[in-house]
C-alpha cells in the first residue's frame, strides 16, 4: 500500500474490540450499484466479518446502502455476502490461523486505490473487558500528559 489511496470507511471500533495480530489486503467482487454507493461513502463496516469457505474468502454482514438513483429491480441487497479477492496462498495461510480458537477476521478499512475498491482484513483476537479498560486508561493518561505539557509551554 505504498501508493496513494482514499479511505472510504474505517472500522475504528474493531481496533478497540479486537487485538489485531496480522493485516491482509483484499479486493472485493461487487455489483455496479454497490460500487456507486461505496464511492459515495454509504458503507458500514462495524458489524462485518470475513469467513473462509471451500478455499474462498467472503465478507459478511457489511452494510452497503442501496444506490439512490437505481430502481428497486436493479439495486443490490444491502447485507449480501461479497467475495474477497485474495491470492490462494494468503487464503491457505488464513485457513490455518482462523481454525485456532479465538481468532477471527474483521474488516478494518475500505479504501479506493487506483480505481479499485479494496478492503483491509485483520486477523484478530477479541479483547477481554479488562483489556478494553486498560486501553481506555492509557489513552486518557496520554491526553492528560499532552494537556499538562501544553499548559507548561504557555
Curated annotation (Swiss-Prot):
GO terms for biological process: trans-translation. GO terms for molecular function: RNA binding. SUPFAM superfamilies: Small protein B (SmpB). It is found in: Cytoplasm. Gene3D superfamilies: 2.40.280.10. It comes from the Bacteria. Required for rescue of stalled ribosomes mediated by trans-translation. Binds to transfer-messenger RNA (tmRNA), required for stable association of tmRNA with ribosomes. tmRNA and SmpB together mimic tRNA shape, replacing the anticodon stem-loop with SmpB. tmRNA is encoded by the ssrA gene; the 2 termini fold to resemble tRNA(Ala) and it encodes a 'tag peptide', a short internal open reading frame. During trans-translation Ala-aminoacylated tmRNA acts like a tRNA, entering the A-site of stalled ribosomes, displacing the stalled mRNA. This is SsrA-binding protein.
Amino acid at each position: 500500500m505504498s501508493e496513494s489511496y482514499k479511505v472510504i470507511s474505517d472500522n475504528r471500533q474493531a481496533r478497540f474490540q479486537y487485538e489485531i495480530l496480522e493485516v491482509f489486503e483484499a479486493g472485493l467482487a461487487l455489483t455496479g450499484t454497490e460500487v456507486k454507493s461505496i464511492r459515495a461513502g454509504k458503507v458500514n463496516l462495524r458489524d462485518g466479518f470475513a469467513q473462509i469457505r471451500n478455499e474462498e474468502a467472503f465478507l459478511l454482514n457489511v452494510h452497503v446502502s442501496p444506490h439512490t438513483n437505481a430502481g428497486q429491480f436493479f439495486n443490490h441487497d444491502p447485507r449480501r455476502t461479497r467475495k474477497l479477492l485474495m491470492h490462494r496462498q494468503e487464503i491457505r495461510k488464513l485457513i490455518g490461523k482462523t481454525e485456532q480458537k479465538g481468532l477471527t477476521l474483521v474488516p478494518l478499512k475500505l479504501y479506493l486505490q487506483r480505481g479499485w475498491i479494496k478492503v483491509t482484513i485483520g486477523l484478530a483476537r477479541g479483547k477481554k473487558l479488562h483489556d478494553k479498560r486498560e486501553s481506555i486508561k492509557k489513552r486518557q493518561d496520554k491526553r492528560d500528559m499532552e494537556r499538562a505539557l501544553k499548559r507548561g509551554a504557555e
